[in-house]
């Protein structure tokens, strides 16, 4: 899964934008290698 500050979804390639637990994810059932997650704030220690 790629993690980047800004993610882009391409619906023509089967991408879907999903919000889970306050984070944005791109999921793709046709091509699972296209999974992405938007990087949020750093975790508190």
Curated annotation (Swiss-Prot):
<dbReference type="GO" id="GO:0005840">
    <property type="term" value="C:ribosome"/>
</dbReference>
<keyword id="KW-0689">Ribosomal protein</keyword>
<dbReference type="GO" id="GO:0003735">
    <property type="term" value="F:structural constituent of ribosome"/>
</dbReference>
<dbReference type="GO" id="GO:0006412">
    <property type="term" value="P:translation"/>
</dbReference>
<dbReference type="Pfam" id="PF00444">
    <property type="entry name" value="Ribosomal_L36"/>
</dbReference>
<dbReference type="InterPro" id="IPR000473">
    <property type="entry name" value="Ribosomal_bL36"/>
</dbReference>
<comment type="similarity">
    <text>Belongs to the bacterial ribosomal protein bL36 family.</text>
</comment>
<feature type="region of interest" description="Disordered">
    <location>
        <begin position="1"/>
        <end position="45"/>
    </location>
</feature>
<keyword id="KW-0687">Ribonucleoprotein</keyword>
<protein>
    <recommendedName>
        <fullName>Large ribosomal subunit protein bL36</fullName>
    </recommendedName>
</protein>
<dbReference type="InterPro" id="IPR035977">
    <property type="entry name" value="Ribosomal_bL36_sp"/>
</dbReference>
<dbReference type="GO" id="GO:1990904">
    <property type="term" value="C:ribonucleoprotein complex"/>
</dbReference>
